[in-house]
């Protein structure tokens, strides 16, 4: 089992527990916004992610940093959940837990998340066309695009929906051609 699968398996019950709490407190939307914010901050701050994953840092130090970083930006429920993660030494998985929570919350709302990587920025017409195609593909009522620009794709785009990846990029086609040439050379 790869380490990513192991982390995802460990993260799942925490994400489910947070969703149960959010549902019980009627705060799914608020906690979803909190989790999006946390994911964005962790994505932007490698130092914070490294600090939280560092086993040499004390639980108290991690709690202080979390309170200082997120305290006034997230709900009390979410902050309490983060403190539980610190106590249980699972705070290093925060980005994965947040992602799993969002997947579960969106599935509950019948919302599909599509991670799109493009070589250039998409205009609104292209985004709407992609949303329509993804709705037809997945039978989802709502589709949310998470778009990132990756010039290394050279051209085209990749779409990731859950574990399914559709790669129409030139980089992907070049890799596929190289793979076929390697096989043919043997």
Swiss-Prot record:
Q: Which UniProt keywords apply?
A: ATP synthesis, CF(1), Chloroplast, Hydrogen ion transport, Ion transport, Membrane, Plastid, Thylakoid, Transport
One GO CC term, this protein: chloroplast thylakoid membrane
Q: A GO molecular function for this record?
A: proton-transporting ATP synthase activity, rotational mechanism
SUPFAM superfamilies given in the database record? N-terminal domain of the delta subunit of the F1F0-ATP synthase
Q: What is this protein's function per UniProt? A: F(1)F(0) ATP synthase produces ATP from ADP in the presence of a proton or sodium gradient. F-type ATPases consist of two structural domains, F(1) containing the extramembraneous catalytic core and F(0) containing the membrane proton channel, linked together by a central stalk and a peripheral stalk. During catalysis, ATP synthesis in the catalytic domain of F(1) is coupled via a rotary mechanism of the central stalk subunits to proton translocation. This protein is part of the stalk that links CF(0) to CF(1). It either transmits conformational changes from CF(0) to CF(1) or is implicated in proton conduction.
Q: Report the sequence similarity comment from the record.
A: Belongs to the ATPase delta chain family.
For this entry, the protein name equals: ATP synthase subunit delta, chloroplastic
**Source organism of this protein record:** Porphyra purpurea (Red seaweed)
High-level lineage: Eukaryota, Rhodophyta, Bangiophyceae, Bangiales, Bangiaceae
């Amino acid at each position: 089992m790869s380490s990513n699968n192991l982390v995802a398996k460990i993260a799942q019950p925490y994400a489910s527990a947070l969703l149960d709490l959010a549902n019980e407190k009627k705060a799914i939307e608020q906690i979803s916004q909190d989790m999006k914010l946390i994911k964005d901050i962790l994505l932007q701050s490698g130092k914070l992610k490294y600090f939280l994953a560092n086993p040499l840092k004390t639980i108290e130090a991690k709690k202080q940093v979390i309170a200082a970083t997120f305290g006034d930006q997230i709900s009390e429920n979410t902050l309490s959940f983060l403190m539980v993660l610190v106590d249980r030494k699972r705070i290093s998985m925060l980005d994965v837990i947040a992602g799993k929570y969002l997947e579960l919350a969106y599935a509950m709302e019948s919302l599909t998340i599509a991670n799109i990587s493009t070589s250039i920025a998409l205009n609104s017409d292209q985004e709407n066309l992609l949303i329509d195609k993804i709705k037809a593909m997945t039978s989802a009522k709502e589709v949310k695009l998470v778009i990132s620009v990756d010039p290394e794709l050279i051209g085209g785009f990749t779409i990731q929906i859950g574990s399914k990846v559709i790669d129409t990029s030139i980089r992907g086609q070049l890799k596929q051609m190289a793979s076929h040439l390697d096989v043919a050379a043997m």
